[in-house]
């Protein structure tokens, strides 16, 4: 079947290798993207040859099914960056967001210090409008290049895109994010702030275990982690999955967790908080075996 594709694909690639949860069965088809031109070829093909597909980056916000994915998984590994001016930088979407924040802050640029603790790609950060209590991706974004559903490369200025808390227009109208351009400022204190952010995250979050980061979005004015803590759920374990004792909004893989373990913990948290009149909405992407 792979011979029918006009580009190279792999079969039966374990998705656990591409998930920070370390959970997931095999992808029926798997394609690594390493350039924008390659992505254009792939999406032009998909426009005329419908096939279920998903796009992944670092897999830091995904929970794959134990059966895997019955379709094509596109792994975005398109990396690179260039300064368009002294304080504007264009970054390809498969680049590490955390590494970008670290490098820029160490060079005296402010605007993306918060990225140092976000273990995903630039494309994933734009898609989720990733951020912290201090800032989010849209705060310094000035332009996004996308490949639309018909395989055409488009450049969209920030003012034409509507972002909100952990939400971008690309969640409702899927497109492949090819690059993002950010506006920076020069600030010699940027590295100090980035270092403090990393130290705080290491102290408060369970980096020693595989996880997908925060499972739930924070309700307005509230902390999901604090709510889960107050509900007495921290430390609850099902199979190999556990609600972190360090941070209530993290579910960790203690070694042999399966998808069902994580989903059951998510359901317990949601039902428990619902009884208190609080609705928690998932931040993590649950990717089923079949779309």
From Swiss-Prot:
Molecular functions (GO terms): FAD binding; UDP-N-acetylmuramate dehydrogenase activity
Reactions listed under catalytic activity: UDP-N-acetyl-alpha-D-muramate + NADP(+) = UDP-N-acetyl-3-O-(1-carboxyvinyl)-alpha-D-glucosamine + NADPH + H(+)
Any single biological process term in GO: cell wall organization
Presence of keyword Metal-binding: no
Active site: 166, 214 (proton donor), 283
Cofactors that this protein relies on: FAD
Gene3D superfamilies noted in UniProt: 3.30.465.10, UDP-N-acetylenolpyruvoylglucosamine reductase, C-terminal domain, Uridine Diphospho-n-acetylenolpyruvylglucosamine Reductase, domain 2
Enzyme class (EC, first level): oxidoreductase
Domain FAD-binding PCMH-type: 22-187
EC number, UniProt record: 1.3.1.98
GO cellular component entries: cytosol
This protein's pathway: Cell wall biogenesis; peptidoglycan biosynthesis
Keywords: Cell cycle, Cell division, Cell shape, Cell wall biogenesis/degradation, Cytoplasm, FAD, Flavoprotein, NADP, Oxidoreductase, Peptidoglycan synthesis
Family: Belongs to the MurB family.
Family annotation (HAMAP family): MurB (MF_00037)
Its job: Cell wall formation.
Protein name: UDP-N-acetylenolpyruvoylglucosamine reductase
Provenance organism: Chlamydia trachomatis serovar A (strain ATCC VR-571B / DSM 19440 / HAR-13)
Gene from which this protein is expressed: murB
């Amino acid at each position: 079947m792979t011979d029918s594709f006009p580009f190279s694909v792999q079969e039966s690639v374990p998705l656990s290798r591409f998930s920070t949860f370390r959970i997931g069965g095999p992808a029926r088809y798997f394609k690594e993207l390493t350039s924008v031109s390659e992505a254009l070829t792939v999406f032009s093909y998909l426009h005329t040859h419908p096939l279920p597909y998903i796009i992944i980056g670092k897999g830091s916000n995904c929970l794959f099914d134990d059966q895997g994915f019955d379709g094509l998984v596109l792994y975005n590994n398109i990396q690179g960056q260039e300064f368009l001016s002294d304080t504007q930088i264009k970054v390809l979407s498969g680049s590490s967001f955390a590494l970008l924040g670290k490098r820029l802050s160490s060079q005296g640029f402010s605007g993306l210090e918060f990225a140092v603790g976000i273990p995903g790609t630039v494309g994933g950060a734009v898609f989720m409008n990733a951020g912290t209590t201090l800032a989010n991706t849209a705060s310094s974004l000035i332009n996004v290049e996308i490949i639309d559903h018909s395989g055409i490369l488009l450049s969209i200025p920030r003012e034409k895109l509507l972002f909100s808390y952990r939400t971008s227009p690309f969640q409702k109208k899927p497109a492949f994010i090819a690059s993002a351009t950010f506006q920076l400022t020069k600030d010699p204190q940027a590295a100090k702030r980035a270092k403090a952010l990393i130290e705080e995250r290491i102290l408060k979050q369970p980096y020693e275990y595989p996880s997908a980061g925060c499972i739930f979005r924070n309700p307005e004015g509230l902390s999901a982690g604090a709510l889960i803590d107050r509900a007495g759920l921290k430390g609850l374990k099902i199979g190999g999955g556990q609600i972190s004792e360090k941070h209530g909004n993290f579910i960790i893989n203690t070694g042999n967790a399966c998808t069902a373990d994580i989903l059951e913990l998510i359901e317990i948290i949601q039902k428990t908080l619902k009884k208190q009149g609080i609705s928690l909405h998932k931040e993590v992407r649950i990717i089923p075996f079949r779309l």
